[in-house]
Amino acid sequence: RNYLETERKNISDGLVIELPVKKKTSEQSEDELKPRVECRPDGVYWVTPKVDKQSGEIIRPCEWIGDRMRTVGIGHDGCDGYLIIELEPEGMEKIIYEAMPRNEIGLPSGWSRLRGRGVAVTTSQKLLNKLAEYLQREGERTQWEVTSTAGWHCGAYVMPDGEIIGVPERPVAFCGGSAAIKGYVVRGTADEWRDNVASLMRGNHSMMLGVLVGLAAPLNSLVGGGCFGVHLFAQSSAGKTTTVEAATSLYGDPEVLKLSWDATRYGLTVEAAARNDGFIPIDEIGQGGRINDIAQSAYSLFNGVGRIQGRKDGGNRAVIRWRIAALSTGEEDFETFLIKGGVTPKAGQLVRLLSVPFIDTTVFNGYDDGDQHARAIKRFASNYCGAAGREWIGWLSANKELAVSVVNEKENIWLSRLPENASPQVKRVASRFAMLDAAGELATGITGWTTGESHAAT
């Protein structure tokens, strides 16, 4: 009676009463015996629960479907829809995110895509169908930015292998792909690269300049710069290829990431888009194909815009665009190379790919001769690669305003040294070297070089 009186008083006072409700236990759940796909720490499984006839307990036999994966978002690149799938490939210590086109889910092309990313997936068609349903119907539906080009997106930097550096304003997924994706590895630390690679280049201005081109690549895009490159030329082979490998080791394995002028024009532009806002190393222009083809490739590469292409289902594909900084080498300057091949160079080509004489390496930094010195740099560039460039990009991501300010300051200094009647082409060249100068000053913590040493290299 006292209880009822108390409750009536609470109701009259406007209080909300929580009546005791008997909740279902997990054993009484209606869905407990429902077959399902489960994502576990060691993979994805098809689970078919059933009641054991003898014990009456529920047992959970399961079949393996693949490595651990789950849908964490959705996105659209302006043409196609995507599911963002979080992957944990066997043997890898990092999580990767794959933007899988919705029209590939459940098809051989989709499973091939996952396997190409290092993910193990069953060959059973029955289980693949279950996996396709799981990816489409379960998981999160957070909106992601989907891009087919690497580089700066939403305030963060997307590496050509899909790795995100920095903190994006919203989640970003990469749906493109570099032909050299396996080259974007990390071996050693940024400090080891500085102490073993950059330190051996000290005092050799042409070698240092090559590294500055690599460092300028992600910086160039932050300030809205266009595509450009530096072509180091000399009759001798004293250090040009070594320089390219050292610069390339900023971002990954030099042997895998290095390109050739023998590639097709379309191939180079697709690779440029995949490495957008990044570094393009192209060794020995004299080893390429026909000179006219190389001239066309160079023009397309530094133009920064791909060709319009039609879609199979009608209409046109989105035009691909890119910004890159390239490092090329050869025995002759680019203009002479073209003229000897019967090609009249365009002014725009020469301004975008700047020919700079390569000064022979003379400072061996503890080694007896140039051969020992070059071999050491090649060895260390392979052993300690990828970390320094990522640390540099991470620093840029956290210090964008400072980086832009230093570039603008350097550009004003370089332009102030020109005659008043300097041509627009000359001013553009000065702006390129101002960019390299700024990269050297900002990246002293990466290279270990002083600002004076970096400035002297430009």
Each language-model region and where it sits:
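Conserved NTP-binding/hydrolysis core of motor NTPases
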Residues: 208, 217-392
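Conserved AAA+ ATPase small/helical "lid" subdomain
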Residues: 374-432
